[in-house]
């Protein structure tokens, strides 16, 4: 399947709207009212207060498509893996659901909406670190969805830990 970026955005938006999510409009690439950073570096940036417990006016199920800028690996720009500006697509549950729904839904998006053969997928799980145990629940869910164990890779907090900084 060959898609234009506008088609991918539409498929992503439609999928999450069918799951009861509301779109959070993107914030500017140079964020206003955030003295902690020069640029918007992730889709979660504007949602930090909500991820910490503050209710969001649009509800508990959200998605966004956020222009993001990252410069921490700027010396590597130009290879096939590094960019400075990109659009980050994300869906968010603010205490409404967790892995048991999220992982099968994302698998559904990849395999049904984007027609990616499940046998071609590789996934990562958190191997544990920084006082946080291994994520065996995600491992079991991916395995149950048919992802072979040799395609489920475990990484520690140095390689597989999401943070605002990316």
Stretch-by-stretch model annotation:
Residues 1-166:
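Structured aminoacyl-transfer and RNA-binding surfaces used for tRNA recognition/handling
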